[in-house]
């Protein structure tokens, strides 16, 4: 590990002096590091590398931070599923709108399909106007263009774009005359009763990869020849000069811009080679095995990567109505939402593992296990009609027994493990104070209730009476008054009451999976 470049190591120091612990952003400028920076000493232990620097600074790196690989931004062909039409014979990727909205796993699967395969179809989106904006806003932000925040795809009397006619539209990407292009496009079908008007998709990355394999010289021409893409109407004039196939610095396909209708006049040398390559690429995109054709029905919303997929439409007769509404969005927000969903899912998996693993241990001498106790507390909160954040706090109030410096068994041996603080601190990585503060204060709430509520102490179980003494005993009058003024005191008292109810052997409760959607909705 110490063979890593010193400047790289120091630039990635994770300490609070170098990075803001709240957001991970650097607190120094690269030019502020000593020009002769060197490692003075280093040791490896417990999965960490500790470095003493020549300027006296100390850094401590987790091994996984040093061993990790750079996955990039997910925009290139690397890691994508390049496809042909036959790959979707079993069906198109997607989900019902209801499942997408209510199940984070379904939402993550849809967004992953857009990222990895380039598209997904949501079915059952209400067939009312402007719903396409709601779909875009479910994972990101609408990209407003000269067409507005949304546009209607239907026959117009004086169209400024062939998309607003009934003629066939060959495979293309949208808005190549913008820089940057809208990286996502959404099309929501409101009505489609006309004969014809089927939708088509072509994986532009796959087509480019085929060109690279069959005609590498043509591929190279299309990656290095800037093409003028132009759009003009009476209120707009747009132009962007970009190659048809754009590569990243490592030579991987990153973006395809292909729109015959918007290609301007190319000038300069090498025109014969360009047009031969252009024609070859166009012919590849029209190969039947690369063209995925399907029909959008009312309520279907197609979401696709406009930097990768070419979309098309067959001609349709005006013997019925065909009306789609579309809008643009961007991949960065979709990728961000997907990453957050996966991060939350990983956190929930960790919590679920606690319930299934350590949660099976006895609960401090009570007749229930740790998991049974917390599930009973959550069930009591739910039965009382408590808001979701308090159900979550009741469910998670004792996780600190697993994540403190001292285990729950230490508490029963006379050592205060401060599990309310360690649990709240651990949960703060995922939940806001509406969840964490009742967890943090639930032990104090027991001490408070014993001080101010006659008869409360007599209701405590033997184990709870013992831990009360270890945790400081009932509050005095001044402590109780101060506690009552705390912002989270009322919620903590509620959690405490459910805590005391949750010690009944064999009491039926929902499992952890029942609360998973509730927790997911509360996560930050």
Locate each region found by the language model.
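Aromatic/His-enriched, Gly/Pro-containing loop or helix-boundary segments
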Residues: 27, 33-36, 155-160, 165, ...
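Short secondary-structure capping/junction motifs at helix and strand boundaries
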Residues: 58-59, 119-123, 144-148, 432-440, ...
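Motif-centric detector for short Cys/His coordination patterns
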Residues: 2-103
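Metal-dependent phosphohydrolase cores
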Residues: 339-524
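Short, solvent-exposed loop/edge-beta patches enriched in aromatic
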Residues: 45, 54-57, 115-116, 382-388
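Residue-level detector of functionally special positions within alpha-helical transmembrane segments
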Residues: 20-30, 118, 172, 306, ...
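Active-site environment of non-heme Fe oxygenases that use a 2-His-1-carboxylate facial triad
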Residues: 71, 76-119, 124-303, 307-343
């Amino acid at each position: 590990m110490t063979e890593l470049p010193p400047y790289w190591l120091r630039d990635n120091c994770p300490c609070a002096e170098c990075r803001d612990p709240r957001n991970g952003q650097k607190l120094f400028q690269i030019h502020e590091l000593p020009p002769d920076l060197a490692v003075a000493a280093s040791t490896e232990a417990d999965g960490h590398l500790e470095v003493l620097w020549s300027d006296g600074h100390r850094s401590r790196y987790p091994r996984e931070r040093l061993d990790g690989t750079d996955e990039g931004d997910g925009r290139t062909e690397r890691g994508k599923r390049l496809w042909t039409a036959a790959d979707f014979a079993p069906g198109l990727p997607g989900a019902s709108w209801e499942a997408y909205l209510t199940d984070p796993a379904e939402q993550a699967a849809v967004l992953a399909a857009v990222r990895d395969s380039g598209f997904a179809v949501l079915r059952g989106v209400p067939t009312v106007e402007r719903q396409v904006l709601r779909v875009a806003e479910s994972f990101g932000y609408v990209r407003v263009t000269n067409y507005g925040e949304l546009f209607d795809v239907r026959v117009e009397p004086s169209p400024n774009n062939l998309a607003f006619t009934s003629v066939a539209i060959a495979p293309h990407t949208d808005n190549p005359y913008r820089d940057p292009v809208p990286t996502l496009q959404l099309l929501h079908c409101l009505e489609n009763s006309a004969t014809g008007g089927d939708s088509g998709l072509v994986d532009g990355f796959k087509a480019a990869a085929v060109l690279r394999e069959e005609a590498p010289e043509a591929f190279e021409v299309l990656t290095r020849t800037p093409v003028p893409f132009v759009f003009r109407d009476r209120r707009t004039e747009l132009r962007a000069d970009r190659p048809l196939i754009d590569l990243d610095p490592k030579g991987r396909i990153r973006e395809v811009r292909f729109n015959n209708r918007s290609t301007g006049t190319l000038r300069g040398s090498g025109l014969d080679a360009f047009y031969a390559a252009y024609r070859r690429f166009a012919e590849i995109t029209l190969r039947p095995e690369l063209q995925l054709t399907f029909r959008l029905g009312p309520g279907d919303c197609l979401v696709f990567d406009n930097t990768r997929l070419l979309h098309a439409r067959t001609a349709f007769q005006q013997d019925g109505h065909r009306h789609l509404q579309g809008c643009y969005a961007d991949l960065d927000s979709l990728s961000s939402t997907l990453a957050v969903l996966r991060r939350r899912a990983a956190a929930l998996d960790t919590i679920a593992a606690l319930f299934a693993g350590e949660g099976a241990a006895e609960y401090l001498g009570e007749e229930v296990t740790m998991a049974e106790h917390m599930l009973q507390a959550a069930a009591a909160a739910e039965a009382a009609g408590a808001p979701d954040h308090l159900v979550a706090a009741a469910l998670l109030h004792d996780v600190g027994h697993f994540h403190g410096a001292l285990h729950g068994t230490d508490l029963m041996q006379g050592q205060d493990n401060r599990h309310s603080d360690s649990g709240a601190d651990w949960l703060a990585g995922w939940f806001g104070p509406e969840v964490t503060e009742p967890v943090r204060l639930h032990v104090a709430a027991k001490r408070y209730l014993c001080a101010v509520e006659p008869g409360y102490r007599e209701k405590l179980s033997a184990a709870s009476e013992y831990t009360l003494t270890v945790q400081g005993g009932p509050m005095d009058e001044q402590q109780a008054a101060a506690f009552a003024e705390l912002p989270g005191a009322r919620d903590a008292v509620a959690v405490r009451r459910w805590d005391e109810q949750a010690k009944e052997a064999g009491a039926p409760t929902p499992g952890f999976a029942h609360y998973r959607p509730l927790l997911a909705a509360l996560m930050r």
